[in-house]
Amino acid sequence: MFGYVTVCEPELKVKDLKKYRAYYCGLCRTLKEDYGFMGQMTLTYDMTFAVILLSSLYETTTKHEEHRCKVHPAKRQHMLQNEITSYAAAMNVLLAYYHMEDDWQDDRKVSSLMTKSLIQGKAKKTIEKYPRQSEIIRKSLKELGECEHENSMDIDRAAGCFGRLMAELFVWKEDIWEKTLRKMGFYLGKFIYLMDAYEDLPEDRKKNRYNPLKELAKRPDYEAQMEQILRMMIAESTVRFERLPCLVDVDILRNILYDGVWNHYNKIQMKKREDNKDEQKSI
């Protein structure tokens, strides 16, 4: 479900793209340092965005280092790390841990049980350190599972589960920015969930998997409706973002929120246009 909150590279300045990658590599390294190889496997673009957002908002002191890694062994990579990077790494691991726990409880996936056991020790310590976030992640994923079991077509209910999850992750500190960050995260989370459901719908139909958009997709105006809903969700999120006094890396943040989040949607539309052309040629 993650991977939608990333940069639009063609619209980003070279220096900003380098800095974005340094944040991404910094999060990757922190995951490895704090949680080992399995923690590193939970790396997401979405939590990289959270690192940049919260680092900008709280003007956190960030250290710059250069390291080699297995992915890029030939050349040292720029890496940016701070205390928020550690927080984001912890949230990555919590999300992965609870997701694997749900997979085991619901579907008895042996692979999930085995992977979960590899990070369980450190995940338990993280749960103790972040009880507020841990409880919301657990409850939100549980309710999402209930939506799936009930085959609920209530789009707002399903998307709201993931919205509340993201809202909690954005609240690093319970302070004056908490309310704005919650709302921003809530609507961004709903956007992520709905974009994922929109992208997965054709495959979910083929494999008879749960997708809350199946009923809406029967309407002739489905495509227009989905675009409108997605635009509403991201608009509500960006309105809250613009209320935050973010100055550092604001061009990167705006690139992600106004352009990057649409990367997958634009690819889907391009593929649909190409498919339509192929169909017309075959007639």
State where each predicted segment sits.
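Acidic catalytic motifs of isoprenoid enzymes
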Residues: M1-K183, K190, L194-R231, V239-I252, ...
